[in-house]
Amino acid sequence: MSIISTRLNSIKPSPTLAVVKKTLELKKAGVNIIALGAGEPDFDTPDNIKEVAITSIKDGFTKYTNVDGIPLLKQAIKNKFKRENNIDYELDEIIVSTGGKQVIYNLFMASLDKGDEVIIPVPYWVSYPDMVALSTGTPIFVNCGIENNFKLTVEALERSITDKTKWLIINSPSNPTGAGYNCKELENIAKTLRKYPNVNIMSDDIYEHITFDDFKFYTLAQIAPDLKERIFTVNGVSKAYSMTGWRIGYGAGSKALIKAMTVIQSQSTSNPCSISQMAAIEALNGTQDYIKPNALNFQKKRDLALSILEKVIYFECYKPEGAFYLFVKCDKIFGTKTKSGKIIANSNHFSEYLLEEAKVAVVPGVAFGLDGYFRISYATSMQELKEACIRIKQACNTL
């Protein structure tokens, strides 16, 4: 009898973290690799947030807290939802967890039974399907390629709904594409969902504050307050405040769901880090002056990367509304032969080719459910980004 559970047979380690690990190994070996695989901002956590954390340590705020988050932080989250999204939540409709990933994991563990279906638009953040599967649910994939601007249409949504559908996932702006749903698109989705009262919606808003040009962010509970009891909104401090390592995410939904998720959390991690919670209060309540400049900085990087990569004859690029990724269509390159005689047959092969030939680490599209694409993160310096994109272009020109 194996010591490893059969539950893990269909679960894969995070492919993005695998790319990061391989990149670090090559760098350690002295290879001049430019890493465009990581999904985290390249600026540091702001000083005012760090200072609150340091003070919290010195003041001895180092003990257990409420499992679902300290009331002061939940109040800051409640105020954030009202201030920025015009949504009213009570404190017992909010949970704080060890990152947005744990919020989502708790959500599915608390709500899914065997055979319950979760509609996942493709491409997707790599962890959605595996978290659904670990919770005994069934992922239902809906292709939303570049021809649909990487967004779910109401026609595709209706075709995917069955009497077993329990959740629909909406991620806007999206990882890996940066595509964002505008107000009208969300209204159309809400209109469709009103016909299906068995379907709940998880809105993953983690990239809310990284948007570009004239795109205006909306979240579904703001657009459709009548569906609020069926909507679970996920957010956190990782992206907007560059606090990926602090591990604070939060979610808001019905009291019954929050209570069930708190039970799950009480038997796994218990409370999130006490010091990180105090830092998150400062992130939400303190100055927001750096958020817009940081988004503008990412916009410049997006434009730089696009200006180089869209000139590659093999590529088709989508101009993202937010986040810090490009999800580039590259299937025209499939079937070509490298100088060493290898055939590039899929996105894994192409990513390996870029790593070997261009010394640039990217994530293959198959990791996000769509072969024929690759993802770059432009959360790096302008100099490194420009050099990496030039290397990619040159590597493609030699094929």
Swiss-Prot record:
Residues at which L-aspartate binds: 39, 125, 175, 375
Cofactor: pyridoxal 5'-phosphate
Matching InterPro entries: Aminotransferase_I/II_large (IPR004839), AspAT/PAT-like (IPR050596), NHTrfase_class1_PyrdxlP-BS (IPR004838), PyrdxlP-dep_Trfase (IPR015424), PyrdxlP-dep_Trfase_major (IPR015421), PyrdxlP-dep_Trfase_small (IPR015422)
Compartment annotation: Cytoplasm
Superkingdom assignment: Bacteria
Keywords: Aminotransferase, Cytoplasm, Pyridoxal phosphate, Transferase
Gene Ontology MF terms in the entry: glutamate-prephenate aminotransferase activity; L-aspartate:2-oxoglutarate aminotransferase activity; pyridoxal phosphate binding
Entry GO CC: cytoplasm
EC annotation from Swiss-Prot or TrEMBL: 2.6.1.1, 2.6.1.79
Gene Ontology annotations of biological process type: amino acid metabolic process; biosynthetic process
Reactions the enzyme catalyzes: L-aspartate + 2-oxoglutarate = oxaloacetate + L-glutamate; L-arogenate + 2-oxoglutarate = prephenate + L-glutamate
Site residues by UniProt (Important for prephenate aminotransferase activity): 12
Modified residues (N6-(pyridoxal phosphate)lysine): 239
Statement: the UniProt record of this protein carries the keyword Membrane: no
Oligomeric form and interacting partners: Homodimer.
Function: Catalyzes the reversible conversion of aspartate and 2-oxoglutarate to glutamate and oxaloacetate. Can also transaminate prephenate in the presence of glutamate.
Family to which this protein belongs: Belongs to the class-I pyridoxal-phosphate-dependent aminotransferase family.
Protein name as it appears in the record: Probable aspartate/prephenate aminotransferase
Source organism per UniProt: Rickettsia typhi (strain ATCC VR-144 / Wilmington)
